[in-house]
Amino acid sequence: MIVESVELKDFRNYEFLDMNFNEHVNIIYGDNAQGKTNILESIYMCSTSKSHRGSKDREIVRFGEDESHIKLNVLKHGMKYRIDMHLKKNKTKGIAVNGIPIKKAVELFGIINIVFFSPEDLNIIKNGPSERRRFMDMELSQLDKIYLSNLVNYNKVLNQRNKLLKDIAFSPSEQLMQTLDIWDMQLVKYGSLIIKGRKSFIEKINTIISDIHSRLTGGIENIKVCYVPDVDVNDFEEEVRNSRQKDIKYKVTGKGPHKDDLIFLINDNDVRKYGSQGQQRTAALSLKLSEIELVKLVIKDTPVLLLDDVLSELDSNRQNFLINSIGDIQTIVTCTGLEEFINNRMNINKIFKVTDGHVVNEN
């Protein structure tokens, strides 16, 4: 899979940008706050329809303008795809694939598979459960459209059930309680499918990550990712029924996969609680490299790797390991300088310098 080019108009600090990428290693360098990450953000949005920063569309449109445009050209399995995305300040974004508008943004998932790695990915290890659920959902949604459909349906049911709980709390009635029975059935139906999907995903990650982490640490550490579902699939219906009165009291659904978590164990110790920052970084790197290998297995193609100022966060051994692991993947890297690549003798195929929203091809 190759990102051939990206064209931006009024996107963040870019009035206009047209970039053509090499199929191997592309370096985008420059000082901080010049617009390097904005380029990666535009590519990521064409994969998931959302910013990795969590930004709203109106925050992405260049200051003083009403809309922005992304055009991405991709080569996948010998077929060309053009993704056009219009972001508007006060309207829903418009998306087209090969000139054909798509009705729902979720239809974009799976067309281009992206693995995005930035220093913020350390949050997957050290922050709260929502970061780890988001990781599972974003990766699974790119690989499995059925999972994505179940996730969308579950979130709709969850929102409707929470709204109904508030109505019941303020004005209880038999009719509302009967409606709650219906939403409970839907919650269990879609929630169970999500739990099964996440369980299978983590099992696959574990078959890959153990070897990667062992090699990364010279064999002195072993890693295991433990999926911790909030409820067991077999007990889900009963758990929801038993928590009903509590849910009505607090006006929110207390049981389900929206409460799931992951635990990362290094040598049987929870790295979030007991690991050093170096161990947490290594665990995050192992996880991202495992993502790459899993995508290869599932789609029978390589993903596009976006590295946002990551090498500066790693020591020389981990830099070398990462660089040696991505030789067959198109990689687009942002950084402030070229020293890490020169020191690691990395083959650089294309170099771009960014200065205040202006990009110069230095090849």
Curated annotation (Swiss-Prot):
Q: Please give the biological process terms from Gene Ontology that the record holds.
A: DNA replication; DNA synthesis involved in DNA repair; double-strand break repair; SOS response
Keywords (alphabetical) are:
ATP-binding, Cytoplasm, DNA damage, DNA repair, DNA replication, DNA-binding, Nucleotide-binding, SOS response
The molecular function terms of the Gene Ontology recorded here are:
ATP binding; ATP hydrolysis activity; single-stranded DNA binding
Keyword Electron transport among record annotations: no
Tell me, in one coarse class, where this protein mainly resides.
Answer: cytoplasm
| Database matches in SUPFAM superfamilies | P-loop containing nucleoside triphosphate hydrolases
Localization of this protein: Cytoplasm
Q: Name one Pfam family in it.
A: AAA_23
Respond yes or no to whether keyword DNA-binding is given for this record: yes
Q: Which residues bind ATP?
A: 30-37
Domain of life from the UniProt record:
Bacteria
Q: Which family does it belong to?
A: Belongs to the RecF family.
PANTHER family, per the entry? DNA REPLICATION AND REPAIR PROTEIN RECF (PTHR32182:SF0)
Q: Could you tell me what this protein is called?
A: DNA replication and repair protein RecF
Provenance organism: Lachnospira eligens (strain ATCC 27750 / DSM 3376 / VPI C15-48 / C15-B4)
Q: Which lineage do the record's taxonomy fields give for this organism?
A: Bacteria, Bacillati, Bacillota, Clostridia, Lachnospirales
